[in-house]
Amino acid sequence: MHVQRIAAFSHGTNGGNPAGVVLCEALPAAEQMLTIAAEVGYSETVFAAPSEGGWRVRYFAPEIEVPFCGHATIALGAALALAHGDGTFTLQLHDTRITVTGWRNNPALMAALQSPRTRSEPAPPELVEAALGLFSYSVADLDPRLPPAIAEAGARHLVLALTSRQKLAAMHYDLERGRRFMTAAGIVTISLVQAETNTRFHARNPFAAGGVYEDAATGAAAAALAGYLRDVGWPHGGMIDVLQGEDMGMPSRLRAEITSETGASIRVSGAARQI
């Protein structure tokens, strides 16, 4: 089974978050997809097979299946554009339909996804306390303008906004402890962000639940963050840029476009490159 390797949300010819992409006539058994994802070793591998009106899609991390993965969807959009020409493709997830658009902008590949609907709610205080302990942060490190939240756009994320770029750069934690915490909390990643401006955010996304210390680019988390900003009335101006992967030597750029409709899909776009 051929696995394409594509880095999504890349910055020029560098960076981005690598994803495996498998285009097949029919989806393999879940156990086989999990095995392939583990062999590939990226944070996610996406599997897609033609179905009525589009493509049936499933996402696998090395240790678990995840309901949605933004960077793998961007990689899939690029792969579909290469295989079938520029266009918009309908993707059937487990419980919703989304679209991804892929196009060639020589020499670059580009893609944009429309996320599942978004929602957010304040994070329980005990969850926040445990998360701060995991990273050796304190309440004083949190940006009071953006209270801790559970945010969703196809997957659940804990959003913690920090006041300091230096604190974000110094992020560290124990992988096994983080895995237990995220699994028990039912969250896919912890989205650690710092607002440089109202529309420019630095981000790091630990993904211990999937056996990955940190994601270089997390499209689902960017969509969830954008939905959260809309919910709290943040002056986003309709668009934010998320800079991720800088502190791990894999610079990534994600753009999220935000409408005024509460809960509406977020458009997340970026470049992609073949590996």
What is the meaning of each model-derived region?
Residues 150, 179-202:
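Glycine-rich, acidic
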Residues 21-25, 48-49, 159-162, 193-195, ...:
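Short beta-strand-to-turn element immediately C-terminal to the catalytic PLP-Schiff-base lysine
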Residues 1-15, 140:
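N-terminal, positively charged, Ser/Thr/Ala/Gly-biased leader segments
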Residues 54, 60-182, 230-274:
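Acidic, low-complexity central loop/insert segments
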Residues 13-18, 155:
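Conserved loop-to-beta-strand segment in the C-terminal subdomain of adenylate-forming
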Residues 32-66, 192-201:
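Anion-binding (especially nucleotide phosphate/pyrophosphate-binding) glycine-rich loop
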Residues 44-47, 143-147, 189-193, 241-242:
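A short linear hydrophobic-aromatic micro-motif
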Residues 66-69, 212-226:
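Short glycine/threonine-rich catalytic loop with a Thr-x-Gly-x-Asp
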